Amino acid sequence: MADPGPDPESESESVFPREVGLFADSYSEKSQFCFCGHVLTITQNFGSRLGVAARVWDAALSLCNYFESQNVDFRGKKVIELGAGTGIVGILAALQGGDVTITDLPLALEQIQGNVQANVPAGGQAQVRALSWGIDHHVFPANYDLVLGADIVYLEPTFPLLLGTLQHLCRPHGTIYLASKMRKEHGTESFFQHLLPQHFQLELAQRDEDENVNIYRARHREPRPA
């Protein structure tokens, strides 16, 4: 009998460990947020099962605020959100006219799907799919106009996996928006200052001093002329 190989979900859990003690008590909480004229009702399912995927983090709110203040145009754009957690960023992109795929590890999909159903009208362009960076990203097309991520840069072993996933998903003239709490102890600054600029044209789009959140915009480097 042939060896079936490693189980993708088990492999992803070894790279993205659950922080069991983070939300030890299990409970759900609904919160409302207003962006771009939309009132979003987001359920956060706190508990050890979801860990960091349970809550709406500051970086996600900063990114939504940025999209509103900069009037970022999602209409007709093919969009994917990575490490979505609650799905708030991707949901806003869908409500703004994007054709959106919202992704995270399998354990977070039920929460995301519930939030999509609560906020995106029937017929809206928002689908929810599992994506484990560096493991199954190649089953997704390589033609996304916009790749979004909020507070997904905090585990150094995942940095090469995230980088490869970004390189695959973003089309040649597409744009990546990454919002991140700048945690020195998690290697976040190193990722944005050293690793990502090796492969993408990177610029700091906005800095939120109060929340210590940076929003970066990245694009593929133009090929050098022969």
Curated annotation (Swiss-Prot):
Keywords: Cytoplasm, Cytoskeleton, Methyltransferase, S-adenosyl-L-methionine, Transferase. One of its GO terms (cellular component) is cytoplasm. Pfam families: Methyltransf_16 (PF10294). Interacts with members of the heat shock protein 70 and 90 families and of the TCP-1 chaperonin family, as well as with HSPD1, STIP1 and tubulin; at least some of these proteins may be methylation substrates. It is found in: Cytoplasm; Cytoplasm, Cytoskeleton, Microtubule organizing center, Centrosome. The keyword S-adenosyl-L-methionine applies. Coiled coil: none annotated. InterPro entries: Methyltransf_16 (IPR019410), SAM-dependent_MTases_sf (IPR029063). SUPFAM superfamilies: S-adenosyl-L-methionine-dependent methyltransferases. It comes from Homo sapiens (Human). Its main location: cytoplasm. Transmembrane segments: none annotated. Its EC number is 2.1.1.-. The keyword Cytoplasm applies. Belongs to the methyltransferase superfamily. METTL21 family. Gene3D superfamilies: Vaccinia Virus protein VP39. S-adenosyl-L-methionine binds at residues 57, 83-85, 104, 133, 150. This is EEF1A lysine methyltransferase 3. GO terms for biological process: peptidyl-lysine methylation. One of its GO terms (molecular function) is protein-lysine N-methyltransferase activity. It catalyses: L-lysyl-[protein] + 3 S-adenosyl-L-methionine = N(6),N(6),N(6)-trimethyl-L-lysyl-[protein] + 3 S-adenosyl-L-homocysteine + 3 H(+); L-lysyl-[protein] + S-adenosyl-L-methionine = N(6)-methyl-L-lysyl-[protein] + S-adenosyl-L-homocysteine + H(+); N(6)-methyl-L-lysyl-[protein] + S-adenosyl-L-methionine = N(6),N(6)-dimethyl-L-lysyl-[protein] + S-adenosyl-L-homocysteine + H(+); N(6),N(6)-dimethyl-L-lysyl-[protein] + S-adenosyl-L-methionine = N(6),N(6),N(6)-trimethyl-L-lysyl-[protein] + S-adenosyl-L-homocysteine + H(+).
